Amino acid sequence: MKKLLGSLAAALICTATASAQMFNLRVEAGPVFSFSSLTEHGTKVLSAGTKVGYHVGALADISLTKGLYASTGLSFEMKGTRDHSYLDGKTLKVNKEALNEITIHYLQIPVNVGYRLSLTPSIRFALQTGPYFAVALGGTQNTGLKTTDAVKSFDIFKEGVFGLDKANRFDVGWGASAMLYLGSIYGTIGADFGFLNVAQTDPSGIADQIKGLSLKNSTVYIGLGYCF
């Protein structure tokens, strides 16, 4: 009986060790810099600077072969845009005195394939890339003129962008990132590029002047993380 229990304990330890080598959990957080721009029929609206957001995530790396791994998880991301557009009647116009700001909070699932290289016993470098899938938990738009105190606010998923067509809650895109590990702590830098127009879902019922309104998420981020 003692030999049997000893054998089972040894097997469990070996299994746990193998699982730990194949499956790693990590958490990371940091700022997101959105350089997305509203476009109208392919023409970019005058930017008002980079919008700063955040990302916080919990991820899992699964070892495939030596150095090669797959990674996925969940992250909360704040993205959006800042520009000088405003709606004059049914026409989208640009004025340096106007400020239009869109803020969208996403729950995002990345699916990456990466390669991790050990430089020393405690220093590792990794590169990864792959698609992401995101759903918006909420979004707002504030638009107005700097010369007045009148600011209009919209829930873009209930009232729409500029109070017109409802925004698209879903986004799909492609991302890439690099990570430098110092023991269990790592720093990361990466970028995500959205494929979908998140500004509107069905432009058929709105004014011809802004049927071509488009917003695709484009972000760069940095962060610090901890690998368990």
Protein language model regions, located:
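Structural signature of Gram-negative outer-membrane beta-barrels, strongest in the C-terminal barrel
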Residues: 100-118, 122-138
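Bacterial Sec-dependent N-terminal signal peptides
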Residues: 1-28, 224-228
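Extracellular/periplasm-exposed beta-strand and loop segments of Gram-negative cell-envelope proteins
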Residues: 35-51, 78-107, 134-173, 195-221
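A glycine-rich, hydrophobic loop/mini-helix early in the fold
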Residues: 72-73, 80
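Residues on the lipid-exposed face of transmembrane beta-strands in outer-membrane beta-barrel proteins
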Residues: 27-33, 54-64, 74-76, 109-115, ...
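Outer-membrane beta-barrel channels and translocator barrels
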Residues: 20, 65, 118-122, 182-185
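Hydrophobic core residues within well-ordered beta-strands of beta-rich domains
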Residues: 23, 54, 68, 107, ...
